[in-house]
Regions:
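Acidic, metal-coordinating catalytic cores used for nucleic-acid/nucleotide bond scission
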Residues: 33-43, 63
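A conditional alpha-helix N-cap/helix-loop micro-motif detector
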Residues: 10-14, 39, 93
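A glycine- and Lys/Arg-enriched "phosphate-lid" helix/loop adjacent to the NTP-binding pocket
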Residues: 54-103
Length: 149
């Protein structure tokens, strides 16, 4: 992979990632992965897994606003991690919440949404199918409110 061709590097990494997922599926090994949910690219995979008898669970780690997400990225960069442009953080923050509430939470077998803004994550809601059990009403209202801005 070449530092002079970062887009080619991202594409190669993506191919490796998808091949690893497919390897686990074929072997019927449990697996997990992290995503921002900013896109809808995993919908087909989730539908396929559920059709094939897999149980699909989503653990969504939420932040109260895009500003905190920017601070988390800045902290990561200060420790040698990769940077993300501010415009991408803002766009992904909103798209992620929209996708969580509009598509993913009801598609998977079970969703747990955690607020990760303090010392200990707090459960905001759990959901199975269309049945949502709200644990933190003010937080879920805040998160749903961001979708409409």
């Amino acid at each position: 992979m070449s530092p002079l061709a970062p887009e080619a590097e991202k594409l190669a990494a993506s191919r490796l990632f998808l091949a690893e997922i497919e390897r686990h599926i074929q072997a019927r090994h449990d697996f997990g992965f992290e995503t921002t949910l900013a896109g809808r690219g995993y919908l087909r995979l989730i539908r396929r897994l559920r059709t094939d008898g897999w149980r699909v669970e989503l653990i969504y780690v939420a932040l109260p606003n895009a500003e905190m997400a920017k601070l988390r990225v800045a902290e990561r960069v200060s420790h040698g991690g990769h940077d993300i442009p501010v415009s991408d953080i803002e766009r992904r923050f909103l798209r992620s919440l929209e996708n969580l509430f509009a598509v993913y939470a009801s598609l998977v077998d079970r969703t747990v949404c955690l607020l990760n803004s303090g010392e200990t994550p707090e459960i905001v809601f759990t959901q199975q199918g269309v049945h949502r059990e709200v644990k933190q009403a003010t937080i879920i209202q805040l998160l749903q409110g961001w979708r409409q801005t």
